[in-house]
């Protein structure tokens, strides 16, 4: 999609492709490289999940790592709540469907510093 829209953007690439997961980011990087687009020199690419192996890509992928243990606990609490089995203290109905999971930005070499306009 990025490559298809270059023509409508005066031949310019966007500054960054922010992908919803690392697998998608890997595909974007591969497609860009196959078309002679350099990552991160021509465009930055980020992923999400920090799956195994992304630190070994070329270039190593900048991504977001979330705490899957916390995410699993939250999912189980929500499932128990929805089944009516939640006697979890401190888990009121007002928290139903809402939760925050800690996340860390893992900066690697697929992103460059944005130039000033």
Task: Describe the predicted segments one by one.
Residues 4-117:
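Flexible loop/turn connectors
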